[in-house]
A protein has these predicted regions:
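Single, function-defining residue in the core of a domain
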Residues: 1-10, 14-41, 45-182
Length: 182
């Protein structure tokens, strides 16, 4: 028992977890279809039929090192996801990973001011001004990743961030991630 105590322990906390994983919060949502369109206002359009999808949306925040939601909220399926991104719920040095539905420059500014790191995929239609552009190459001269410092402008908000573009070898694509400027 003594040799395997950490593996056999009933303590559910993970031992040996990287420190940054303990700081990572993942925000996501999923839609549960209920009653077709009879009761709930639809969200989006089905790509084949063009009909709207009704139901409820489950929004959750998960501590990555625990794998269990720490915040779960239910809304109509048509509710915009960005309400879940509440900067006051996050502390200095925490990392928040979220999808494109959560892009909100005012909230990104608040997160940056609080010292919270955020990472999200970039929407294709975002407009920005490039301030710095640097391509990092491997020894063979191929791009490993590209780092751009940019300014996103919306109304009176000027949010400085960085865009990281890397090559996804499995998919043959170049996904773009947005993160605060660190």
């Amino acid at each position: 028992y003594a040799a395997n105590k950490n593996l056999l322990s009933s303590d559910s906390r993970r031992n040996g977890t990287e420190e940054w994983i303990k700081q990572l919060r993942i925000i996501d949502s999923t839609t549960i279809t209920l009653f077709s369109n009879a009761i709930f206002k639809g969200v989006g359009r089905h790509p084949r039929t063009g009909k709207k999808k009704g139901g409820i949306k489950v929004h959750s925040v998960i501590h990555a090192n625990e794998g269990v939601p720490c915040d779960v909220q239910f809304t109509s399926a048509a509710t915009n996801d960005s309400f879940m991104l509440a900067p006051s719920h996050y502390n200095h040095n925490e990392i928040v990973a979220l999808d494109r539905a959560y892009i909100n420059y005012a909230k990104f500014e608040e997160l940056t001011d609080r010292g919270v790191v955020y990472v999200t995929k970039m929407k294709k239609n975002l407009s920005y001004e490039i301030m710095v552009d640097c391509i990092h190459q491997n020894p063979e001269g191929l791009m490993e990743y590209r780092e751009q410092v940019v300014v996103f402008r919306k109304g009176d908000i000027n949010h400085i961030a960085r865009i990281i573009t890397y090559v996804d070898i499995k998919k043959g694509k170049k996904p773009k991630l947005i993160s605060l400027l660190t």
